[in-house]
Amino acid sequence: MTTTFERQGDIAVGSEAKPRRAPAAALAAGAVLCASALAMHLRGGVEDVEFVRRVEATPDAWLTGHVFMGVGGILLLLGLVALPRLVQGRGRRVVAVGVTLAAVGAASSALGDVAHGTLAYMLVGEVPAEQSLHIQERLYSQPLLVAVSMPAMLLPLGMIVLGAGLLYSRAVPRPLALLVLVAPIAVQLGYMVISLPMPLMVLPLVAAMGWLALLVARGTQTGR
């Protein structure tokens, strides 16, 4: 069946995208899990013994947060791949590039976080904090693990490109596109400025992905 479009400027009213409830649910759930993990994560220097001791003081919370991030990253990946269907024509390639970068970053982040969180958890109570730090530093300097974990930096970059593509495409409301742009910047600020409350800094991520999930679930394109 052929779907027709009415054009208002460059905005497509209606869409060929079909409702996709599974990717929508994955996108929303992934954002909630990642946001929860970020809010739980200990902030500060990760290359000192004092940080290791902080992990040892709350090992269960540490592991839970990293498992949340791992599962959330995979769910985000599954949800992100449905987003290009929301965009027709204008901005579609930019959105596709952003989704690709973010998906690769999400997969890398998921693997790296689970490995990092599990190792630190397993060492709690088994070796002194100084030795635990030494073991972790040696392991994470291995070329294979570096190759697996480094692409995680593509996740925030991909989100920024995705937001720019959505803004240019006019396929979604402008406030939503701006939320997608702001979300990774807010999270990075939360990491850099310890005085900022991380639960507040992850709200743009949850709001943006939740809003996108609604559009994916409906299979519609709304314009600005």
Ranges and model annotations:
Residues 2-224:
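Hydrophobic, aromatic-enriched alpha-helical segments typical of multi-pass transmembrane helices
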